[in-house]
């Protein structure tokens, strides 16, 4: 179980998350939506302890371990994997070197023969040319190629909780299908949980979320299922009745 309890986070002396709460159980898919500036990306970056964001109070825990004050690499080693909307280029580092080093950081013994065999199988699954392994990380890659690169890391490193921040950004219809299909297949095989920040109807439909949350002013104000997502996308955030709505969807008398 992954839990965020009463999380308060600030950046540049401005409070962004103001009592954020979230619980994700094994194999669940959660969609997080909200207006611009509501704090969606801050949630993911706070989990990972991005240096720009300061947790001032609250708790983050995963599988019984308190991650509130953990270092980023400790969060990653706990089984949490992050895919953001703009994966960065890393000059001078080959994909193969990065992924092999990441496996070794988990304590796995990696011989080059079995590693290449595993990589080729993942490339086939993602319909990727294996030559990408000899390219520098994300260098000269399109948006779709970069997202596939991130999915490659998911299949290789086998995380149990995946955070996806606008993973559909810059992708065409076919690329979104590939992303969704891989996430569903991976979840079915491993029982992993997903926290997905998106406003893309086709991705939401394909992922079949268990829960949809709408965040505003740094906290979740509405919870529901995928109907909430589509109502919001069809009518806009301004159509939602925020006042008096509890996070279980009931009315506050």
Question: For the regions a protein language model found, what residue spans apply to each?
Answer:
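Conserved structural motif at the start of ABC-family nucleotide-binding domains
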Residues: 2-4, 17-19
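ABC ATPase NBD coupling module
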Residues: 66-81, 232-234
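Walker B catalytic motif
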Residues: 166-168, 174
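ABC ATPase C-loop
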Residues: 154-155
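Conserved beta-strand-loop-alpha-helix hinge in the C-terminal portion
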Residues: 215, 219-242
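Conserved ABC transporter NBD signature motif
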Residues: 56-65
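Q-loop/switch helix immediately C-terminal to the Walker
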Residues: 86, 92-106, 118
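The feature captures the beta-strand-to-loop junction immediately N-terminal to the Walker
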Residues: 33-35
